[in-house]
Amino acid sequence: MATALITGASSGLGEVFAHQLAGKGYDLVLTARREGRLVNVASKARQMGAKQVEVIAADLSHRDGPAAIMRELATRGLQIDYLVNNAGFGTSGRFDRLPLERELEEIDLNVAALVALTRLLVPAMVERRSGTIINVASTAGFQAVPYMSTYAATKAFVLSFTEGLAGELVGTGVKILALCPGPVKTEFQSVANNEKSTMPSFVYLDAETVVAQGIAAAANGRMVHIAGIVNFLTAELQRLMPRVLVNQISRRIYRPNADA
């Protein structure tokens, strides 16, 4: 059976990807920093149908993280047919008040690690003329987001990178998708310190819905998928609006209480 590598698999969308792909019969390689959490996710994935589940504890915010994962894959004799670049986090607040080291870690994890793993794994997929890559972007990638400036910029990169690579991979048998969720009910908001944003509750989707839509969109050869009809309509509307107006609206939604 085909094997899927899922980054950021210890919680949130990554955990749900593990469970849903296990239910489809995929063998799994799960990676994240928290090995204990990965072991628990792996146990449930086996119950849901995955015959083989490997756990690799690694920190992809370090530049040597992707290479370490590749070495471990080689040691265990594992071939990756399906890559889910899900690992990432966001920060929120005024940029000039945020710790620089944390902002750089965000860029390394959300961008550099994704590019590295894609570059390291896609040649073998092209050679086999078969493979699937899902890069988890965000609706934040369609416009700048004040108070989440770095995060939105990283997701804009993921979106553009995926679309560009999709053009290069035409005819190779390799499918690549940018999955663009809006707000999702996961621990992301607490990690980003953004639990008190004024985002209306009706735009939030559950992780199971987002992942199911992403898997289906990738299977159908889609290049970009925006999860949720409200998020889709919002993203399309923003294309027609003046950028300064979009910026002002985003500023009001994401502005921390201290800066209100």
Predicted regions and their residues:
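SDR active-site lid
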Residues: 166-230, 244
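Residue(s) in the substrate-gating loop at a strand-loop-helix junction
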Residues: 138
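Substrate-binding pocket helix/loop in short-chain dehydrogenase/reductase
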Residues: 94-107
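Conserved NAD(P)H cofactor-binding loop of Rossmann-fold oxidoreductase domains
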Residues: 86-91
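Conserved glycine-rich Rossmann-like NAD(P)H-binding loop of the short-chain dehydrogenase/reductase
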Residues: 24-41
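Active-site helix of classical SDR
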Residues: 118, 154
